[in-house]
A protein has these predicted regions:
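Conserved functional hotspot residues or short segments at active or partner-binding sites
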Residues: 355-356, 360-546
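Short, Lys/Arg-rich N-terminal segment immediately upstream of the first membrane anchor
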Residues: 1-9
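Polar, glycine-rich mid-to-C-terminal structural blocks
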Residues: 302, 314, 321, 325-390
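Hydrophobic membrane-insertion alpha-helices, especially the h-region
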Residues: 12-28
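Structural motif
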Residues: 135-137
Length: 546
């Protein structure tokens, strides 16, 4: 893609030139995992000379390493939004969500008031075996105080993760105590899950939620499908809402389970990468089952590959809102110091031939696209969706569009009927999350005895958690507005209770609770009940009469 931009000669650009010279010269004259850098030498000589001039004559000593680290992200950002540089330190955790496991202590945590709070402890993991409990506050790591502004997600993960069988000493404060407990945890392999929920929506409909597409997503899906088969499911909903993508191969494996032999799943093509087709091999076990795929504005990349394959082959119905629109393929390439880049090398195309990548020539517009769509009303009305890309056709002849995500077959607007400014402030301020953590800590002993989401829901309603939240919010700057609270009562109660359920139980229980009155789930069940999950061919145009 040609991207003509005016470039001013600024210190940053000089740094970029230096880095390019470095890459051409001796500083980075090594391999990307066996792949040599190919850079045009005619330009390289000039830039390399510039590097030597700066190194020889610049008024101050130049730290070449610092220039590299600062300028690499800027270089790649000139290409596209998804080509990125990852430092060696960040590279340790960059792919943890997509790997089948990582080495750590086995906790889920949040950071509140500059302190790590243990949200959940993974069963039979290193932290649980050592005695760490949900609700603990971690204030020391290896005898060093770890609270305050330095406590970030990245820094916390860097300190808590580490090689298997190494030890980390934690200083924790337990709820209701003042004294620091010291606990030594031996790090171990922690499994990561992509399939975060799997259960029966009703007597016939199975439901699977996929958070991302990692190394183990396909086997996790097969296990979930096998369990649903034991329950006798005869139709399936795959929820990709909020799924930001992952490995293309994982999406292809899953699509293969539902498509017939020879059907195209996706193809990729780039300037240096010839077209490569990925087709179903006919061995999938669920080629005939009625299928619905749920997407929203956060569904991206590999999630869009799966949704596009199902839609273009008319294999099932897509329900939700228009997806993100990421149709670029990145290849990881590692430097000798273990830093790496993810470079866009190709685009992917759905079976009908459409590239669903949204335009990115204007970086500011690209980053602001989500808010632009929101303000334009696209989340609330299907008529507000603008199709600027070319039209394509599915196997049955239905019209679909490229250039900006997967548009669902059935649109589900964001629910704003009972939304008020009080609700928006309560959610956006983080007060609901803060209240949920506080309430959980204060009632953990009682709540932890409940293993069933519906038992917990009944209990929370009996405790009038909404009123408790309103009092908490009033004390923390969000003044009570009774009329608005009454109008948004259902939304507020749903949000408050869902976060408490998540804190105590797990993501499966949280998903089940939210799905019970989810408009997209309700529409899915209606579609299956009416036998309309398989898209039909467009009706022939009615004859004209004169």
């Amino acid at each position: 893609m040609t991207n003509n931009k005016h470039i001013r000669f600024t210190p940053l650009w000089m740094a970029i030139c230096v880095v390019i010279g470095i890459l051409i010269g001796s500083f980075y004259a090594n391999h990307f995992s066996g792949n040599r850098l190919n850079i045009i030498n005619s330009s390289g000589n000039k830039l390399n000379n510039l590097l030597h001039i700066i190194d020889d004559q610049y008024v101050d000593t130049v730290n070449v390493n610092d220039l590299v680290e600062k300028a690499m992200p800027q270089i790649l950002s000139e290409l596209d939004p998804h080509s990125v540089y990852i430092t060696a330190r960040d590279g340790e955790i960059a792919n943890d969500d997509l790997r089948g496991s990582f080495s750590g202590i086995g906790i889920e945590f949040t950071i509140r008031q500059d302190t790590i709070r243990v949200q959940n402890v993974i069963g039979n993991g290193p932290a649980e075996r050592a005695g760490v409990l949900a609700g603990d506050k971690i204030v020391e790591v290896d005898d060093s105080v770890f609270v305050g502004k330095k406590v970030t997600n990245a820094e916390a993960m860097h300190r808590l993760k580490g090689p298997k069988d190494t030890k980390v000493k934690l200083g924790v404060i337990r709820y209701g105590e003042q004294k620091i407990r010291h606990i030594i945890v031996t790090r171990g392999e922690i499994p990561t899950k992509s399939v975060t929920a799997s259960y029966m929506l009703d007597d016939e409909t199975g439901y699977i939620r996929i958070k991302n597409f990692g190394e183990n997503t396909y086997p996790e899906l097969l296990i979930a499908l096998a369990k649903l088969s034991q329950r006798g499911f005869s139709s399936l909903a795959i929820d990709l809402r909020g799924n930001t993508g992952g490995y293309l191969e994982s999406a292809v494996q899953i699509a293969n389970e539902f498509l017939s032999k020879g059907q195209l799943i996706v193809y990729t093509e780039g300037r240096r990468y010839p077209r490569q087709d990925y087709k179903a091999d006919g061995r999938g076990s669920y080629q005939q089952i009625p299928l619905v795929v749920l997407v929203d504005e956060s569904s991206a990349s590999a999630a869009e590959i799966l949704a596009g394959a199902i839609q273009d082959n008319d294999r099932g119905t897509i329900i939700g809102r228009r997806s993100f629109g990421k149709g670029l393929v990145q290849k990881p390439m590692e430097f000798s110091d273990h830093s790496m880049i993810r470079l866009t090398i190709a685009r992917y195309y759905t079976p009908s031939g459409r590239c669903i990548q949204k335009p990115y020539a204007d970086g500011e517009d690209y980053e602001g696209d989500w808010m632009k769509r929101y303000k334009h009303g696209e989340f609330f009305s299907q008529d507000s969706i603008k199709h600027t890309g070319p039209a394509y056709h599915t196997s049955n002849g239905r019209t679909v569009y490229g250039g900006g995500g997967i548009t669902p077959d059935i649109f589900i607007p964001e629910d704003t009927v009972d939304m008020t400014s009080y609700y928006k402030e309560a959610t956006m301020s983080g007060l609901i999350l803060q209240f949920a953590y506080t309430y959980t800590d204060e009632n953990r002993a009682r709540l932890s005895k409940m293993e069933d989401v519906w038992e917990m829901e009944r209990y929370l309603k009996s405790q009038n958690t909404l009123e408790k939240f309103v009092v908490y919010a009033d004390k923390n700057g969000l003044k009570r507005r009774n009329l608005m609270i009454q109008k948004s009562r259902k939304l507020l109660e749903r949000f408050v209770n869902s976060r408490i359920i998540y804190n105590i139980l797990n993501e499966q229980a949280w998903t089940e609770y939210l799905n019970q009155d989810d408009p997209a789930i309700i529409e899915t069940l209606r579609l299956f009940k009416n036998g309309d999950a398989f898209p039909k061919k467009p009706e022939a145009a009615a004859p004209n009469h004169a």
